[in-house]
Each structure stands twice: as structure tokens, then as C-alpha cells.
Design a protein with these regions (language model features):
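Hydrophobic h-region of N-terminal signal peptides that target proteins for export
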Residues: 8-17
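Immediate N-terminus of the mature polypeptide
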Residues: 2, 16-443, 454-613
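Sec-dependent signal peptide recognition
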Residues: 2-8
Length: 613
């Protein structure tokens, strides 16, 4: 779309100004210089566009510079809030900005395009009650910098909030009292989704992440398939964030499509901050027809599954005097009961192992967590504030599986840490999980999983801000069931690689991606070019991974996103697979929607077995 407008402006500037087109001998010096600074093209375009009113209006309205304005470093640091530590909070004022026009750095800006003005009028701003019920701070309390930072992060994590800033305003007549101004900016919460899987199937959906500004979510999707029944199905959901200010999230849904037929209801409360004393959740799901236990499960059944799934957990913070000087440290004890009963399922495998077994599982965990956050931007988002976690989460889990095919014990150790190095330019996350079920005959369904995630500093190349992302993952299955295999077509493998033949009990993957955030936006849509290289190897558990054949994918792509809208990121990707199996083409192109990647936040959780996926 951007290049269409560029071409229109160039053609219009030539025709409306009366200038002719002449062909001259190439100036190699100018070409080389332009390659070094691609923004010169837009600067030149702006000059051409300014020659008449029509093209000047198109350029100013549609193509704009999105370089970040100078950000007050005090607003970005913990030290800013620390200067007001223990001051009494006098008043809390909440100001909600329009979606289009102003931002947190200049609240006086206004929307200029008619479509932006219309969207501002149609949108229902988050009510003051919704914002206040998500506040941990109260008038009359002593100001705690950690609480302020955590509260900002909590509000930013809400699906209908774009960004938030807490501004401290000292009182001139009383130095011991401060007022707090909270600036919030919503996203346009109404959205559409859709996709075409092939000529025979597709879907279209509609949703609202902030119904009437009260923080409720509702959505429905029509899913069609001409070859499978029901030919036209639907799935709907309804959820409430933070029911009555208790920080309990409620969700319920029903679906009847060719993929599955089920209904569910859930309540969840997390350890949202280190000071959280308790957390837990309840979930009930009745699945009448499905090929998986969970939609993110890697194991699928060739025959329909019919089952009842119940799950409940509770966790509590332990105050045992361990590390009392660290306010970001949290030690938790949690327990879980998970029940599943099948009414229809496939037969056991040749070894009489049954992945889809009737089971009641009891789990307990002891977790040690330390977490804090650094603010940055242009990591996974496109200019809004992002909270980068640093710290660790270590957990020890024990369990007992009351299984119809034989009772067994379970245990795992999970270690993870993430930090920033060299005054915040680089981020490195590592994790190691080792676990297994235990029977009298030995261990089964064991796993060793090692991950490394690296994010580079934001650097400039050809006057464009860029980052590099590197992920390394090594997973080994130990005595896994025959039906359980690792593949290369999920988020840990090779993107766009749809092979069903490349699988095994052991996997090694390396993903390298370079992202180039563009300095220009069109109608508030930001974009980023990216290049990638994915390498994956799978094989049997009893053989060296380096003796197996490798698969790879490399290519380029474009991501387009507006942080003012609730829509997912639009992605165009072209890939080449040099060493591909027969069920994968050598060239792959895709246009799809992708969800925003999230950081691992070192938040204590309910105990559950390590996933082999």
C-alpha cells in the first residue's frame, strides 16, 4: 500500500507540475549514496510532492515520520519515582487520551484525518471505574516506586490499553504530599479477523476487546469448510478482566465447527506482582468432538476425542524470612488437581501406551522468583512502551498421576534467568527444564529442554533502527510414547515449514531474525522489514542429533501494524527451503496475521508437567 501511494505521488507531481520525464545517464555516485540512506528517497519525494497542493496534502496526510521524539529519561526510570518515595499520595487524576492524535509525549496533538476523527467519536473510552479498579495505589498511601512501576505495567498489559504513564506532580505548599496524574490511551477495541486456509475452507470473525469501555470482551467467528461437517460453524467467547477489582479474570466460550465442538468456563488469578499473596484458577471444559486435548497440543488423534476436562490450582506466597531485603523476591507454594475422563478415544499403541488416558493428577510446586522490569521500545512492538523483564524463576515440581494404565510419580526441575548486559543494550534469556514420569519399570515420557533467547541492542543501519533476534532450542524426549513426536512446523521450528514427515524424539533448532523498523508510517500503520534464517534437525532419541539431515528456511518479509488498533500484525513472508522433503515446496509465500510476541515474565504459576512440543 505504501508503494502505491509513493507511485501516485510521483506521477501526480510530474503531471500536475507540467514537468516532462527525461532519461539521463546514471550517476553512480548518487545511486551509491542513496543506497546508504534510504530516507533520502522520501525526502526527495517530499520535495516533489510539495510542488502542488494535491500531492503535498497526500504526502502530509498519509506518509509521516515515526521517529521517536526525545523521551524524558526520568519518565522511563525507576529513579524518577524513587525521588518521591514515601511521599503521601494526595490525589489521583486519570486523563484518558483520544486514540488518534495525541500521545503520551504531546497530549496537545489532535487527529487530522476524517477517518481518525470518526474513529475517536465511535470509540468508547475506558471508564474511570475500569482504570481505578486496576490500581494498587490509593489516596493517602505512601508512594512506593515498585508499586508505581508494577501498576503501569499491569495497565499496559490490558488488551484494550495502548500505553500508560504515571506522572508525579509535587505540591508547592506541602513538600510531603504529591499528586499523581495517570495518562492512558486506549486502542480501538473493535476488530475483524479472517483467513483462507485453502479454496475449501476459511473463516471470518468480529470482536470487541472493551465493550462500551467497561473492560469486557466478546467475539464470534464463522468457520466454513465445504468438505467437512458442519460446513458452516461458529465459535464465540465472552470474558471479563479483573472481576469487581479482585484481579480475577473470567472467561467462557462455546464452539461448534468442523475442527471441534466444545464449551468451557474458567476463572484465573495470577501472581501479578511480587507482593501478591495468593493466586489460583478453575477451569471446566466439555469437549464433544476434537482431535486434541488442547489446541496448542502437538499430539493429535486420528479419531475424534470426546472427553471431560477439569482443572484447579491454588498458590500462596511464603514469608519465611528468606532474602527479606529484596522486595522483588517471591517464594510460593502451589498445588494443582487435574482430571480428565474420555468417552471416545483411539486404541492404545503397540506397547499398550495410551496418551489419551483417564487420569487424575495431583501436583505440588515450590517456586523461587525475582523479577523487575526495564522500559524500552521497538522490541516486539512498534514504538509504544515495552516492559522487559529481568530476574529468574526456579521451580521444583512433584506429582502423582492416578492413571488407568498404572499409577506413576512425576517430578521436574525448571531453571530460568534473564538479564540485560552492558547498561541495557543486550537481553539474554536462558532456561533448562528436566522432568519425567516414574514407574516401577523405570521412567517414561521424560524430557530435557534447553532454550536461549538473545535480543540485540537497538542499532542504526542506513539510518534505520534495527534489532537482531537469535533463538536456540534443544529438546530431547526420553521414553516418549509412539504417538509423541517433535516436528519443525511450530514456533520452535522453521517458519512456514509444513512437513509432517520430518519428526523425531530429539530436536535442535536455530532461528536468526533481523528486524528493520521503518521510520515512516502510513495512516498510523508502522512497518518493519525482516530477514530470517531458520535451521532445524530432528531425529531418534538414541542417535546423535548431528548425524541427522538438516532442514532450513531463509527469506524476507514485511510486518505492518498499527498500535492504535486491536488487530493482529499483518505479515507477508517469502521463504526458500534449500533442503526440503517431498511434502514441502522449495518456495513458500504467506500473507497472514500474527500475534505479538511476549516476554517470559518470571511470574510464579500453577504447577504443571513440562510440555513436549
Amino acid at each position: 500500500m505504501k508503494f502505491v501511494w509513493v507511485i501516485l505521488i510521483l506521477l501526480s507531481s510530474l503531471s500536475l507540475s507540467g514537468e516532462g520525464i527525461s532519461i539521463q545517464k546514471k550517476d553512480t555516485a548518487k545511486v551509491a549514496f542513496a543506497k546508504k540512506d534510504p530516507n533520502l528517497f522520501y525526502d526527495s519525494l517530499e520535495v516533489k510532492a510539495s510542488r502542488n497542493q494535491v500531492t503535498r496534502w497526500i504526502f502530509n496526510k498519509l506518509i509521516s515520520t515515526t521517529k521517536k521524539e526525545a523521551i524524558n529519561p526520568e519518565l522511563q526510570s525507576y529513579e524518577y519515582y524513587r525521588t518521591y518515595e514515601k511521599k503521601i499520595i494526595g490525589s489521583i487524576v486519570i486523563k484518558s487520551l483520544e486514540i488518534f492524535g495525541p500521545d503520551l509525549y504531546d497530549t496537545t496533538k489532535t487527529a487530522t484525518l476524517w477517518i481518525e476523527k470518526t474513529a475517536n467519536k465511535l470509540h468508547s473510552k475506558s471508564s474511570l471505574y475500569v482504570i481505578r479498579k486496576n490500581l494498587w495505589i490509593k489516596e493517602g498511601q505512601a508512594l512506593d516506586p515498585n508499586t508505581i512501576m508494577d501498576n503501569e505495567r499491569l495497565l499496559r498489559s490490558l488488551p484494550y490499553i495502548k500505553d500508560v504513564r504515571f506522572i508525579i506532580v509535587p505540591r508547592k505548599l506541602n513538600e510531603d504530599v504529591v499528586d499523581i496524574l495517570i495518562l492512558t490511551q486506549d486502542v480501538f477495541s473493535f476488530g475483524l479477523s479472517g483467513g483462507i486456509g485453502s479454496i475449501n475452507n476459511g473463516e471470518i470473525g468480529i470482536y470487541d476487546k472493551n465493550v462500551l469501555g467497561i473492560g469486557h470482551e466478546i467475539g464470534t467467528t464463522l468457520i466454513a469448510n465445504t468438505n467437512q461437517s458442519p460446513h458452516i460453524g461458529f465459535e464465540s467467547y465472552y470474558s471479563i478482566n479483573n472481576v469487581k477489582g479482585n484481579f480475577i479474570d473470567f472467561s467462557t466460550g462455546y464452539s461448534n465447527t468442523y475442527l471441534y465442538h466444545r464449551l468451557f468456563v474458567s476463572f484465573e488469578r495470577d501472581f501479578l506482582r511480587p507482593q501478591s499473596t495468593n493466586a489460583g484458577g478453575l477451569m471446566a471444559m466439555r469437549s464433544f468432538r476434537s482431535d486434541k486435548i488442547n489446541q496448542d497440543d502437538f499430539v493429535t488423534s486420528k479419531s475424534p476425542l470426546d472427553y471431560l476436562f477439569l482443572d484447579g490450582w491454588y498458590g500462596r506466597k511464603l514469608n519465611l524470612g528468606i532474602n527479606p531485603k529484596d522486595s522483588r523476591f517471591q517464594m510460593t507454594l502451589s498445588g494443582r488437581i487435574r482430571y480428565i475422563s474420555f468417552y471416545q478415544r483411539p486404541l492404545p499403541d503397540i506397547n499398550n501406551n495410551q496418551y489419551f488416558a483417564n487420569s487424575t493428577m495431583y501436583l505440588g510446586s515450590l517456586s523461587f522468583s525475582q523479577r523487575s522490569y526495564i522500559r524500552d521500545y521497538l522490541v516486539y512492538s512498534y514504538g509504544i512502551t515495552e516492559d522487559i523483564p529481568k530476574g529468574y524463576l526456579h521451580e521444583l515440581v512433584f506429582g502423582f498421576d492416578k492413571n488407568e494404565f498404572g499409577n506413576r510419580l512425576y517430578s521436574h526441575l525448571f531453571l530460568s534467568t534473564g538479564n540485560l548486559f552492558k547498561n541495557k543494550p543486550y537481553y539474554l534469556y536462558t532456561s533448562l527444564g528436566v522432568g519425567s514420569y516414574w514407574k516401577r519399570t523405570g521412567l517414561e515420557q521424560g524430557i530435557v529442554d534447553f532454550k536461549v533467547n538473545f535480543i540485540s541492542q537497538l542499532f542504526n543501519i542506513w539510518n534505520v533502527q534495527a534489532r537482531q533476534f537469535i533463538k536456540l532450542n534443544y529438546t530431547v524426549g526420553i521414553n516418549r510414547f509412539e504417538i509423541e513426536d517433535l516436528g519443525l512446523h511450530n514456533s520452535e521450528g522453521i517458519r512456514g515449514f509444513g512437513s509432517s514427515t520430518e519428526k523425531g524424539k530429539k530436536r535442535l533448532t536455530l532461528n536468526i531474525e533481523n528486524v528493520f523498523f521503518q521510520n515512516r508510517s502510513i495512516l498510523n500503520f508502522q512497518s518493519a522489514l525482516f530477514s530470517f534464517l531458520d535451521i532445524g534437525i530432528v531425529g531418534p532419541a538414541n542417535q546423535s542429533i548431528f548425524k541427522q539431515n538438516y532442514n532450513a528456511g531463509l527469506g524476507i518479509g514485511l510486518r505492518i501494524r498499527s498500535e492504535n488498533l486491536i488487530f493482529k500484525t499483518i505479515q507477508l513472508r517469502l521463504a526458500y527451503y534449500p533442503n526440503h522433503p517431498n511434502d514441502v515446496n522449495s518456495i513458500g509465500f504467506i500473507l497472514d496475521e500474527v500475534s505479538k510476541t511476549k516476554f517470559y515474565n518470571f511470574q510464579p504459576r500453577g504447577p504443571e508437567p513440562l510440555k513436549f512440543e
